[in-house]
Design a protein with these regions (language model features):
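A structural preference for short, hydrophobic beta-strand core positions in alpha/beta folds
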Residues: 49-51, 233, 326
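Alpha-helical packing segments of well-folded alpha/beta enzyme cores
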Residues: 36, 166-170, 174, 216, ...
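Structured segments of extracytoplasmic/periplasmic soluble domains
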Residues: 35-46, 104-112, 173, 177, ...
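C-terminal non-catalytic alpha-helical accessory regions
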Residues: 147, 422, 426, 433-436, ...
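Surface-exposed patches in mature extracellular/periplasmic domains of secreted proteins
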Residues: 45-52, 114-121, 185, 287, ...
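Catalytic-core regions of glycoside hydrolase
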Residues: 160, 180, 204, 211-219, ...
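Feature activates predominantly on carbohydrate-active enzymes
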Residues: 16, 32-35, 39, 72-78, ...
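Acidic, contiguous N-terminal accessory segments
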Residues: 3, 11-85, 115-119
Length: 575
């Protein structure tokens, strides 16, 4: 993008700009035009909006034509920008392609102090098929009367969920970073979002809250849809709504119970109602946590979940297939996918990139084999940058680390999609651990902007030239911190050098990884010097960093002077 903006036709001062859209412009094309208009207005241009007539009739006026084209040389979500004289055409392979083509123009305006430095000829499209971030409707404590993962959507538990202005800011951030999916994590969301004719008592919130939820989720999915964003609802299995379970004398979750016709019917109808009611939604299915056997996983996925999705589509008269994601956690993904792919094609698998941490851009070992096995199943594989306890609570944002990590997702794991957790404070969304001078808490989107921008940029294209990227990030950081690109280079170096610290510390000194790891949460001396006294994950050491030694192994070699070191610890020791 940064390099593309160097190819331009310079505009002479502030002027009138016309934005033309066809008479049948889709909601995504109209959204693109509005976003472009807002940017040009802020840059001081007089903007004329023209829908219907797309004839370039006045060569004296700078004109931008937005259109969807049936150009099979472009990938999905791809675009083609051409500039000849005063006419710039943005042609999208689809509505999302127009959105991203307009984002290219918007970035060119913002990165050139408001000049209309548009590309003369540029084609681009994303590498990764799904590129998205998640927000959790979950908490670290149980609600009264509920079990783990059971959090109905209510203003008391999640007041931020009902803040439309905050959602618009979040969705616009996703668009600006070329992301096309929003993942919402919750144990059993359906009883907060849909009513079932056969099970009216299953609703888990009061009528007033249900109306709020209905209105908010409709708002969220509609706003996401016009931005080309799928809202993908995650849920655990098998979890029942509390009033449904109580009505039939059941537990809300019981890992040892078999699938019954009643439980299957309730879940299938819940999924169907969800698909029918809300636009541009998908599902992220976790078969782990509350299922009995792998055989049950296959039956549940193919005879309950997929039929529920198809029922919802049939009610709408739709023939497309929304994305259906299968999380590899605690299930046999291959067995499930082998049974599911013949009956549903738009399937994805998902697995954690470095487990529940961020430790390396050189993954290897048995955990990497899980990824390669999944990516060979015949569907798109998603790399999940999962909860990142080793980065807590500090800000982190190394462009170099992220670019290399995304390259590893492609080259080592075979992944072609991204699921991204917040950089820190997942359980405390939307706030960070920081306080502002006025005593208010800082928002994650304000503090951790570089987290989303780096992952979004490299999910779109991880093959960018490193020299160009240094220039790009120097400029971005210079704009953000109000300094020159040259001075901002020092900030970038600080981000990149400090970005190696937490990953290296955990992969060499931690006893495990993720939301259970103790390195930064209060590690005992005995855990540091003799991890074998505790539960360690051998796969972590074998997979989430370069080959090396634990501290106890390093010291033993030093004591015996019998073997050469094979560890990053040697360089740390020499320092």
């Amino acid at each position: 993008m940064f390099a593309a903006c160097t190819l331009f036709l310079a505009a002479c001062g502030k002027q009138t700009v016309k934005i033309m859209t066809p008479p049948d412009a889709s909601n995504r094309v109209q959204f693109s035009a509005e976003q472009l208009q807002t940017t040009l207005d802020k840059a001081g241009y007089q903007v004329m909006m023209q829908q219907g007539d797309t004839t370039f009739s006045d060569p004296e006026i700078k004109t931008i034509l937005l259109t969807e084209v049936n150009d099979t040389t472009l990938k999905k979500e791809g675009f083609h920008i051409t500039t000849t004289g005063n006419l710039t055409k943005v042609s999208g392979r689809d509505g999302s392609g127009v959105i991203y083509g307009c984002r290219e123009l918007i970035d060119c305006v913002n990165d050139s102090d408001g000049k209309l430095n548009f590309p003369e000829d540029l084609k681009d499209a994303p590498e990764m098929v799904l590129r998205g971030a998640c927000v959790g409707l979950q908490k670290m404590t149980y609600l009264p009367g509920h079990g783990v993962y059971e959090y109905p959507y209510t203003p008391e538990s999640f007041p931020w969920f009902y803040d439309k202005e905050q959602w618009i800011k979040y969705l616009d951030m996703l668009v600006a970073n070329r992301m096309n999916s929003l993942y919402l994590w919750n144990g059993h969301p359906f009883a907060s979002l849909v009513k079932l004719e056969d099970y009216p008592f299953a609703l888990e919130v009061d009528e007033e809250t249900f109306k709020k939820n209905e209105e908010m989720f409709s708002f969220l999915t509609e706003e996401a849809d016009k931005r080309g964003i799928f809202v993908i609802q995650m849920f655990y299995n098998i979890i029942l709504s509390k009033p449904f379970a109580e009505h039939y004398g059941l537990k809300t979750q019981d890992r040892n119970r078999p699938i019954t016709p009643l439980i299957a019917d309730y879940t299938r109808k819940s999924i169907a109602a969800f698909i029918e009611k809300y636009p541009n939604v998908g599902l992220l299915v976790c078969l782990g946590e509350a299922m009995c056997t792998v055989e049950d996983d296959v039956e549940w996925f193919t005879e309950t979940i997929i039929p529920g999705v198809k029922d919802g589509l049939q009610a709408l008269g739709r023939t497309d297939e929304p994305p259906l994601l299968l999380r590899a956690h605690d299930t046999d993904c291959k067995l499930v996918m082998d049974a599911a792919l013949p009956i549903y094609k738009n399937l994805y698998t998902m697995h954690k990139y470095n487990g529940e941490s961020l430790t390396t851009y050189e993954p290897r070992g048995p955990w990497s084999k899980i990824h390669t096995d999944l990516s060979s199943l015949g569907s798109i594989h998603i790399s999940n940058v999962h909860i990142l306890a080793n980065l807590e609570p500090f800000r982190w944002g190394s462009p170099d680390f992220v670019q290399k990590a995304v390259q590893a997702m492609h080259n080592v794991h075979g992944a072609n999609a991204l699921h991204l957790y917040p950089q820190a404070s997942y359980w405390d969304w939307p706030y960070t651990a920081d306080k502002l001078p006025n005593g208010e808490r800082e928002f994650q989107l304000d503090r951790d902007w570089i987290w989303y921008q780096t992952w979004g940029r490299y999910a779109w294209n991880c093959r960018r030239d490193r020299t160009d990227e240094i220039g790009y990030w120097n400029h971005q950081l210079g704009k953000f911190y109000g300094t020159s690109d040259e001075n901002a280079g020092n900030i970038r170096i600080a981000y990149e050098e400090s970005g190696e610290i937490a990953p290296k510390l955990l992969r060499r000194f931690g006893i495990t990884e993720g939301n259970r790891q103790t390195l930064l949460l209060g590690m005992f001396m005995s855990q540091l010097v003799n991890p074998y006294k505790y539960t360690i994950y051998p796969g972590f050491y074998e997979s989430c960093g370069p080959e090396g030694e634990k501290l106890i192994e390093f010291v033993e070699k030093e004591w015996k002077r019998s073997e050469e070191h094979t560890s990053e610890l040697q360089s740390l020791y020499l320092i």
